[in-house]
Swiss-Prot record:
This is Cytochrome b. InterPro entries: Cyt_b/b6_C, Cyt_b/b6_C_sf, Cyt_b/b6_N, Cytb/b6-like_sf, Cytochrome_b, Cytochrome_b_C_euk/bac, Cytochrome_b_N_euk/bac, Di-haem_cyt_TM. One of its GO terms (molecular function) is ubiquinol-cytochrome-c reductase activity. Heme 1 (or BL or b562) is low-potential and absorbs at about 562 nm, and heme 2 (or BH or b566) is high-potential and absorbs at about 566 nm. Its main location: mitochondrion. PANTHER family: CYTOCHROME B. It is a multi-pass membrane protein.
């Protein structure tokens, strides 16, 4: 029999082993679609971003005008920009759902895969932050000022660090040019780490909703899951295109239609919606360094999750108490997101503080406690 080029060619066999003949559990649900959706989001963002970069000028006097020019005069420039801006939102929606799936089904027990995933999340957050500064509107400028200024809370080296990051004594032209350079570079870093993420995943194979070994019942990725991923893709593209074409500015801030002005501070400085939960945690602590540490902890806490798993069962499928706690955490994150968008006044301050306390309590204390309790209940 003639050798199959798909299995013998040095490059094609890597593709084959990752996307075609990959042995996959037969019972993974639609919650396992988000990995491929994230890959599509990344490719879309890189392509639209590349096209936008061709018309963008990283200079404080021209940045705002160059973005306006792209939308007005470049063929389909408005569409490319709207796809890129809203693509970021969908990227975050997918990554939050992907992480939620990992938490619910105990996927974090594949520690290397989980840790590279957390690094991917941090890199994505950095990319989105520097990207938001590029249009050089009011919220771009003041967002950059507020967030970079947080580094000054680091004892001893803080102020030096901030001025080094700014390239001067305030957010100005050097800041914009380096942010553009970083925004261009980081997506390719994300692509590289994604390959590492997949390499670690394929060492163990996918988890499944039952959390038990699926070695006895595997099916090839293609055609079963390739077709399922295409379905997931079409289902994501419908709301994505609806948003980008009918209300492209729905998730944006009106302040960003005003060019950056260092002399006028917007009444409410707030980041894009996908950072609001972390922003609310930052603001809930009335101390600069404490807030910065809480902000960092809100994401880095994910690295501790594998060590806090106390249950004898991997997934939450048959653990109603943990399920209740999980959905409580989801509701809590929605409350934090809402609080992050509100002004710093009563009653929002206390609500934010309670929600922040709940967030850390649920993850660090209640999940391990409930896991241990469920083990005891199983023994009766």
């Amino acid at each position: 029999m003639a050798p199959n080029i798909r299995k013998s060619h040095p490059l094609l066999k890597m593709v084959n082993n990752s996307l075609i003949d990959l042995p996959t559990p037969s019972n993974i649900s639609a919650w396992w679609n988000f990995g491929s959706l994230l890959a599509v989001c990344l490719v879309t963002q890189i392509l639209t971003g590349l096209l936008l970069a061709m018309h963008y000028t990283a200079d404080t006097t021209l940045a705002f005008s160059s973005v306006a020019h792209t939308c007005r005069n470049v063929q389909y420039g408005w569409l490319i920009r709207n796809l890129h801006a809203n693509g970021a939102s969908f990227f975050f929606i997918c990554i939050f759902l992907h992480i939620g799936r990992g938490l619910y089904y105990g996927s974090y027990l594949y520690k290397e895969t989980w840790n590279t995933g957390v690094i991917l999340l941090l890199t994505l957050m950095a990319t989105a932050f520097v990207g938001y500064v590029l249009p050089w509107g009011q919220m771009s400028f003041w967002g950059a000022t507020v967030i970079t200024n947080l580094f000054s809370a680091i004892p001893y080296i803080g102020q030096t660090l901030v001025e080094w990051a700014w390239g001067g004594f305030s957010v100005d032209n050097p800041t914009l040019t380096r942010f553009f350079a970083l925004h261009f570079l980081l997506p390719f870093v994300i692509a590289g780490i994604t390959i590492i993420h997949l390499t670690f995943l394929h060492e163990s194979g996918s988890n499944n909703p039952l959390g038990i070994s699926s070695n006895s019942d595997k099916i090839p990725f293609h055609p079963y899951y390739s077709i399922k991923d295409i379905l997931g893709l079409t289902l994501m593209f419908i709301p994505f295109l609806t948003l980008a074409l009918f209300s492209p500015n729905f998730l944006g801030d009106p302040e960003n239609f005003t060019p950056a002005n260092p002399l006028v501070t917007p009444p409410h400085i707030k980041p894009e919606w996908y950072f609001l939960f972390a922003y609310a945690i930052l603001r809930s602590i009335p101390n600069k360094l404490g807030g910065v540490l809480a902000l960092a902890a809100s994401v880095l806490i994910l690295l501790l999750i594998p060590f806090l798993h106390k249950s004898k069962q991997r997934t939450m499928t048959f653990r109603p108490l943990s399920q209740t706690l999980f959905w409580l955490l989801v509701a809590n994150l929605l409350i934090l997101t809402w609080i992050g968008s509100q002004p710093v006044e009563h009653p929002f301050i206390i609500i934010g503080q309670m929600a922040s306390l709940s967030y850390f309590s649920i993850l660090l204390i209640l999940f391990p406690m409930i896991g241990t309790l469920e083990n005891k209940i199983l023994n009766y």
